[in-house]
């Protein structure tokens, strides 16, 4: 019923009821109260119906705005129930917040800025204490009440705002984004995807620093912020970050100590994926890192310094990766001591070393599940997606016991490569580095994305027809024993 229909109904019912009740009052005093109750109920029903219709209409006429900063919650809820669900979760764990929340926090301090302001004196100070004070106010029962003691992680990724120049580039970016959404959903990680240039002069690979810094302030409840380049693919959906391994460190980067600290090679690490703790050390570090970028008046000088200092650097451009190597090697005690160069697994693997091995790796996992044992039969059981982590742990144990080699998931490990990074392929720009062909990049990206997607689709009873096909087929019962 439309809202315009309910209003006349309410008015006419009231006016007619008024005359009827007056006559009833004179003749039948006992019926007067019943008549008023009846009319009140009719009016109330009409009013409620009108409000519900107006709300429903408003939801269609005023859809939620789409911004260029998109956040994905780790636990999906329907749009209609988002506020109610969040309020219920907050109430369950004793979260205190909202516009009228008591107590001032760093958000009320006008001197605290989300922006990277290169060259400006000051910056955020006392962040550890400010963050702790915010959490005491907002989480009086403790932050980890809903996360089984896990440290919270926010993943940040992003791409450019304009459409891609390369043919099919936007479609590839969508597939890369889907891959990250899938991983985050399976592992309880929140994803923030940004395509706004938060600092106009910090272009290209430098744009990650303002995004990560802003995420730290927007998510003080997150212990870690995890930057992942747009062209990086999660190729092991079972793997969870070993955060306990980094308890004494504030920055985790894929790299090698010898190449960074001994040889000072500009390719001794890769800055396309990194994990950084939400703390004062990290804010100070990113300020120092940003001062070597294009927003700095000394940008050209830093390019010359990096060229003269780092082994193998042929150009005089100050890029984020070279700057990171310089900071760690030049200030090893200040920055290097709290940085973990991860090489025990493919925190980000070079795609050329990975994609040709994916078929063999998939066969290795399937062989472990086809073994004639009760444990393998248990792994083949169909299950709900929310049970993924339990099955992942059991599957890793089965493969580890069946396949020789280290546990890392690197070039010789038994594990799937965790992240495969298509550095140099430039899927959005359309022109890969001259050392790669377009076909090798296209096939490699498609193969890696399908390899990862098969791990997700299995929970839904499907897989890709072949490693390079978009077509999917249903899985037989008791897969992979039945093929």
From Swiss-Prot:
Any one GO molecular function term: galactosyltransferase activity
Xref: InterPro entries: Glyco_trans_34 (IPR008630), Nucleotide-diphossugar_trans (IPR029044)
Carbohydrate-modified residues: 144
Lumenal compartment spans: 62-483
Record EC number: 2.4.-.-
Membrane-topology annotation of the record: Single-pass type II membrane protein
Cytoplasmic compartment residues: 1-40
Enzyme's top EC category: transferase
Sequence similarity: Belongs to the glycosyltransferase 34 family.
Name assigned to this protein: Probable glycosyltransferase 6
Organism: Oryza sativa subsp. indica
């Amino acid at each position: 019923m439309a809202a315009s229909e309910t209003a006349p109904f309410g008015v006419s019912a009231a006016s007619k009821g008024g005359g009827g009740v007056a006559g009833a009052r004179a003749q039948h005093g006992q019926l007067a109260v019943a008549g008023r109750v009846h009319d009140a109920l009719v009016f109330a029903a009409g009013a409620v119906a009108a409000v519900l219709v107006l709300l429903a209409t408003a939801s269609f006429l005023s859809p939620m705005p789409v911004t260029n900063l998109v956040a994905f919650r780790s636990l999906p809820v329907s749009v209609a129930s988002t506020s109610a669900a969040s309020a219920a979760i907050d109430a369950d764990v004793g979260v205190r917040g909202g516009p009228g929340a008591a107590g001032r926090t760093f958000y009320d301090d006008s001197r605290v800025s989300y922006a990277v302001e290169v060259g400006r004196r000051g910056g955020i100070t006392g962040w550890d204490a400010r963050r702790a004070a915010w959490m005491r106010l907002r989480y009086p029962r403790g932050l980890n009440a809903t996360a089984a003691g896990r440290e919270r992680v926010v993943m940040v990724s992003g791409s450019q705002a304009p459409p891609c120049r390369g043919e099919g580039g936007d479609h590839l970016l969508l597939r890369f984004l889907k891959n990250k959404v899938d991983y985050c959903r399976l592992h309880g990680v929140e994803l923030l995807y940004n395509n706004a240039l938060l600092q106009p002069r910090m272009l290209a690979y430098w744009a990650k620093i303002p995004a990560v810094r802003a995420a730290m302030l927007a998510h003080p409840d997150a212990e870690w912020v995890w930057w992942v380049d747009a062209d990086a693919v999660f190729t092991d959906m079972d793997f969870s970050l070993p955060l306990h391994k980094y308890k004494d460190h504030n920055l985790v980067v894929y790299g090698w100590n010898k190449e960074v600290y001994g040889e000072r090679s500009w390719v001794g690490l890769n800055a396309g994926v990194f994990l950084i703790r939400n703390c004062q050390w990290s804010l100070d570090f990113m300020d120092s890192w940003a001062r070597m970028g294009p927003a700095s008046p000394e940008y050209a000088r830093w390019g010359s310094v990096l060229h003269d200092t780092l082994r193998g650097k042929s150009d005089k451009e100050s890029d984020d990766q070279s700057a990171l190597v310089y900071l760690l090697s030049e200030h090893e005690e200040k920055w290097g001591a709290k940085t973990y160069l991860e090489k025990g697994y493919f925190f980000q693997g070079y795609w050329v070393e990975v994609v040709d091995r994916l078929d063999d790796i998939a066969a290795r996992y399937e062989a472990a599940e086809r073994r004639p044992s009760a444990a393998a039969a248990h792994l083949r059981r169909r299950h709900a997606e929310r049970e993924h982590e339990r099955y992942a742990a059991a599957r890793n144990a089965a493969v580890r016991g069946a396949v020789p080699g280290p546990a890392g998931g690197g070039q010789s490990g038994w594990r799937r490569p965790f992240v495969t990074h298509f550095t140099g392929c430039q899927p959005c720009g359309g022109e890969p580095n001259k050392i790669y062909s377009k076909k090798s990049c296209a096939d490699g990206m498609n193969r890696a994305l399908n390899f990862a997607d098969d791990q997700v689709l299995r929970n839904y009873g499907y897989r890709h027809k072949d490693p390079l096909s978009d077509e999917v087929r249903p899985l037989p019962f008791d897969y992979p024993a039945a093929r």
